[in-house]
Amino acid sequence: MAAPSDPPTAATPPAPPPPARRCLLAPSVEPLLFLATLALGLQVPLATQYLWDRLGAERGYVGPNASSPHGCGNGSGAVDPLREEVEALVAHWNLCINLGGFFVGLFSVTLFGPWSDSVGRRPVLVLPAVGMAVQAAVYLLVMYLRLHVAYLLLGRIISGLLGDYNLILAGCFASVADSSNQRTRTFRVAILEACLGVAGMVASVGGGQWRKAEGYINPFWLVLAASLAAALYAALCLQETVKQRRAAKLLTLQHYKAVYKLYTAPEDLSSRRKLALYSLAFFLLVTVHFGTKDLYVLYELGSPLCWASDLIGYGSAASYLAYLSSLGGLRLLQLCLEDTWVAEIGLISNIAGLVVISLATTTPLMFTGYGIMFLSMAATPVIRAKLSKLVGETEQGALFASVACVEGLCSLVATGVFNSLYPSTLHFMRGFPFLFGAILLLIPAAIMGWIEIQDSNLQYSHFSDASSSPADG
């Protein structure tokens, strides 16, 4: 009898909520990561070249710079002391800027990452994108107003306080872990890593040419625009992936304790041991990636390769293509192999390619090394996915915050170790750092193989016990 009193139009009021949606589509974090990586990929080399030109001009140095199109420009002529002074100053400021950003970011990433497990991923993706935009704006002010280069450090610290690029990495990978299941997670992570490669390729190929044509100002406006676009996408279009959000204090030591407990909590000793071993494997693998990538251009510029800028560009594009070929190879190999063995094949590809590059004396042999490394990026998404599967749903933010900090540490260690090793070994083998990297990669290969064999033996023993127990009964 109450039914007639309900008007037929009573179902229409719930309609207003859809227009309240902030965006027509809220698909995934891939566009956000692409934009942020594009901004970073443009900014880092441009900032280094700007420091070179600015500091060189202040000291009256007018010789060739790091972006000159000459191959073997450092032939057998006398060493220019003024050039050495400029190189030392650029290295000094680069080190200060990178260290300042790393140490500030170390505390902010491990604060915001666990916080996102409670309040959601969107806030911790908006903040670092805004920080990167502020950093780009500060860099533009330095260029327009010819401010002291120390202001570049200020921009980097501001970005670090808001989490910097490492927090974007942590938030994106945690978001993928939230929205994927155990079976599909590895491939979803690989898609994210492919975005890193595509964005890096676009920045590498386009940024240098644009700088040569129009200077520094216009490319840095694109850095600012890409960072702002990433922030707007995260704020307005990105779908929240944390299912059960709750209010949580930001400024508390509990967030740092959450990261610490990942590796020390005694509930599941086996999982925590695997977490530490996989983290070590990830550290070594990414350190080799960063360290060798830093040396490719130096190696190609020197004798006997003597590459000009066009060949260097092709080589850079070939190294980034490994992200895409690894994605396709991972997908195909997953049809017949466990993820660990796919990663082992990727490590073998990486090791073989580095050995060939270490011995390369001709252009075809150098490109052969790049070609052999077509599966070299298959191991990192597997390790990230393995780490993600070892922790609970409410620990993904804390986990990927710690992984992002490890990645930042890898960059510093790689720069220190490989850039020191290269000049020290020139007198007996120019390619020794690549051979050293190949040897280091044997350690993560051994770690992953050992864990997989141990797990297989454990599963086999459980299966044997289960099959023999009915007979005993």
UniProtKB/Swiss-Prot annotation:
One of its GO terms (molecular function) is folic acid binding. Its main location: membrane. InterPro entries: MFS, MFS_trans_sf. GO terms for biological process: folate import across plasma membrane; transmembrane transport. SUPFAM superfamilies: MFS general substrate transporter. Widely expressed, including brain, aorta, liver, kidney, spleen, small intestine, pancreas, ovary and testis. It is a multi-pass membrane protein. It is found in: Cell membrane; Apical cell membrane; Basolateral cell membrane; Endosome membrane. Glycans are attached at residues 65, 74. GO terms for cellular component: apical plasma membrane; basolateral plasma membrane; endosome; endosome membrane; plasma membrane. Belongs to the major facilitator superfamily. SLC46A family. This is Proton-coupled folate transporter. The lineage of its organism: Eukaryota, Metazoa, Chordata, Craniata, Vertebrata. The gene is SLC46A1.
